[in-house]
Amino acid sequence: MRTNRKANYTEDEVFQWLESKPIGSVIYISFGSEVGPSVDEYKELAKALEESSQHFIWVIQPGSGKTGIPKSFLGPVQTDSEEEEEGYYPEGLDTIVGDRGLIITGWAPQLLILSHPSTGGFLSHCGWNSTVEAIGLGVPILGWPLRGDQFDNGRLVANHLKIGFVITSGVGEDGRPRRFNKDDIAAGVERLMIDVEVHEQAKKLSKEFESGFPVSSVNALGSFVEFISQKAT
């Protein structure tokens, strides 16, 4: 692992943990390094994981749960002498879940995790790179879009490709969709992990890309959808 990729687990430790779990039993949770859910939503996610029996890897970035402009937008990466940006961490969850869960703070070997046979689902913000990686490796996606084109990517996953779902919530007293709670999250995870058709479709679609993605398709949603449509005909 490169020295500038700070984390509390090495790649080998992550691999060995995955090796100890049944095939398709682990959900991988990562929201990227820029914008994630709020602190309150992270707490609901932690409750959902605590109360379930689900194996999971949860990646938490420095500054998670904070509002405002991410530090990655403001300039060069901080040096080793600078303090890490503090953020949300599910205190005590690792003790409660024991070996059922792996909570990674900092950088995670995403391709290693997604490509491992024990990984059976990906709870994702639906960022473009993460979405493409999951599609290419045949991993079903549970979308938690947060901004911009992530919502389009979530619809692509759920409605067009049919290789996953988007978390849904009920309606609040004001008639607008409310924030996700632990029950919404738990229901979405359970649905994703047990849906045989979604898993079969994800594996089937990944075989179309065993030779790789065209560059234009990786870089642009429109080109990718067009490429998918051509493959389907």
Label the predicted regions.
Residues 1-233:
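Catalytic core of nucleotide-sugar-dependent glycosyltransferases
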